[in-house]
Amino acid sequence: MIPVADVTDQTALKKLNRLLTDDLDFHDQDSRYASHSFHAFPAKFPPQLPAKFIQSLTNPGETVLDPMMGSGTTVLEAFLLGREAIGFDIDPLALLLTKTKITPIHPHQVMALGREIVHRAKVSFHYRRDEIEHELSTCWDEETKEFINYWFAKDVQIALKAILNEIEKVDDEDIKDFFKLSFSAIIITKSGGVSLALDLAHTRPHRVGRAVDWNGNVVCDFRREHAHTKRVSSKKIRSPFEEFEHRYTQNVRAFREIGFFTDQMNMFEYFDKPVSRLKPYVAIGNAQCIPVNSSSVDLIVTSPPYASNAIDYMRAHKFSLVWFGYTIAELTTHRRKYIGAEGTRDVLLHNLPPNTMDTIERLSLKDRKKGIVLHRYYSEMKNVLSEMFRVLKPGGTAVFVVGNSNIRGQDVSIPECLSEIGTSLGFLVPGIGIRRLDRNRRMMPTSTTVNNESQIQQRMHEEYVIGFYKPLRIQDL
């Protein structure tokens, strides 16, 4: 297909290019308003970024899609701005997070119920320990049980199970999900939460050398395992009951401050004009096969995964998901379906545009398997871009926020290759914006040592914002 840009297209392209050349850093702006701070999530972009494109490129009532919604930033911003928001993700924790962030609650009811949950869980912790320990010994298979025992101290396991048992008794599914997300949020944190991990928000967990619980008891001492290191990491694990109560209270407060209650769809104070809110639609879904009608979406704002699985979301998310009934085996199988995964068996590799194929071939000369992994990534991203082209209305735009990747010492040109693939499918790409990352706020993977050769450290200082425009007219070859 050959895209043909008429006068209307040229005007739209100039507007899109101006947006891409604006300041996209947002370092001096608060990104924790509304429900954006409900739960840690690696590599999420600031809400001001999708808001900028939503406000500039769509009108209230029009449709905004994020087919790889992650923490739901685009979906929430579209909802707040009165657009019809649609979101999909393959990650079950992403669905729970986004659904909770956009679902109004009754704060007094939730606070009262939360206090009951904590009270009953504490009673179970002190007086039903044997029963809960029996539940813990029977509710997982051996592999999952081994994972739990490795990463969670015994008293923490009992406390978490006691809390979760009470959450599961809640009848209202929306309120139950609200509490489940609060439960997950005390595990997946920058400090590793109530687990024995040092850091889960950046997705690369390391177990502590020594841990003390909230009563001052030593719950684990693995210093022999760390004998080769000069400094042994230690951690004080806070009470799961107090952490859970603090988290759900904080999340309720966020809703209360902005008037986001059941049957009360008031506009937030920081918007100039009130608009009608449209209930968002979010579900589990694969961006390579978007369950949306053709030519029905006005704008897409999304952030695709890094190539070669550089940010492994499941590595951290499984710490919570195992408590919700998933086994390690199920999550491992599920992880292989992610775009950017490193599996090379039974994958469909597309013929790609020349510069993209050249990039793949140069990497293959250094490392054949990594070359196949990169070919898989670009093939899957071609599927994604093809689907986005299908669902966008003529004159619609897709905005990609992507990071670059350096594999085996080679820059694999993510923004350039994705632009080339998009152009081959019929998109017009007027420009690529650059935004400098505030690494502490973007929550990128960290390292305990400085390694100048690390591919993580080499590439994660900036990211790219690509604008894909679907022209009003396409000419067949």
Report each predicted region and the residues it spans.
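Nucleic-acid modification enzymes, centered on SAM-dependent nucleic-acid methyltransferases
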Residues: 4-60, 81, 86-302, 306-354, ...
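A short glycine-rich, Lys/Arg-flanked "PGG" loop and its adjoining helix->strand segment in the class I
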Residues: 378-394
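Conserved class I S-adenosyl-L-methionine
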Residues: 61-70
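Surface-exposed cleft-lining segments at the edges of enzyme active sites
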Residues: 364-375
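Conserved SAM-binding loop of SAM-dependent methyltransferases across substrates and taxa
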Residues: 73-83
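Short, well-ordered beta-strand micro-motif
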Residues: 467-469
